[in-house]
Amino acid sequence: MNNRKVLIAIATIMGVLILPRLSIVAQQSDDEPPEMGFFVSSVSIGDGGNLGGLAGADAHCQSLATAAGSGNRTWAAYLSTQGVGAVNARDRIGSGPWANSAGVIIAASLVYLHYDNSNINWEHALDENGNQFASRIDGDPDFSEHDILTGTQIDGSAFPAGQDQTCNNWTSNDEGSARVGHADRYSFLTPGSPWNSSHGTPGCTQENFVSVGGAGLLYCFATD
């Protein structure tokens, strides 16, 4: 057998040995859960509706994500603003898909995220550490933190100017109101409540939020 035939034979054997290994590596890669791209903030900023504007809310999401090991991504809070230069929450969170901290896909795109298409509910709306928020669903009828600040209509767009839905564009910890969604999709114990636009709060203090089942928590999305 000449040298050329020997080389061909060796290459054939190596191909038989290597290709299955590459296939296994590819399969392992396919089986890896997607990177976290969504979470409910585990804690609030703590100053009622004064989040420091959109920038302050985004920084809060980024800080929590970084502490949880996902600081390599760019994070934004799902919040709208009103009035001149109004911002739509849906326009500031990227295009998806987004997975929670357990690797479950919350929504594949903006279309699937809104209305009743998303996977946002008490089971899957986890915080950045993989924990569930307090809800009446878990057995305590008198305590819930399912109200999540959004200032947003059901389709993810901003409310028109007029009645405050954003605590003065997330700068007020006193007067005004914030539109919230129910992350567990329940109103008391009745299912079907929107995750992003359920009701307004009676004011913008931290105490106002707590009084109606909230804590000033945020939805955080990876934009990249």
How should each PLM-predicted stretch be described?
Residues 9-21:
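Bacterial N-terminal signal peptides
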Residues 23-224:
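Secreted/extracellular ectodomain signature
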Residues 7, 18, 64-67:
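Short intrinsically disordered, low-complexity coil segments enriched in acidic
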Residues 1-10:
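Bacterial N-terminal signal peptides that target proteins for export
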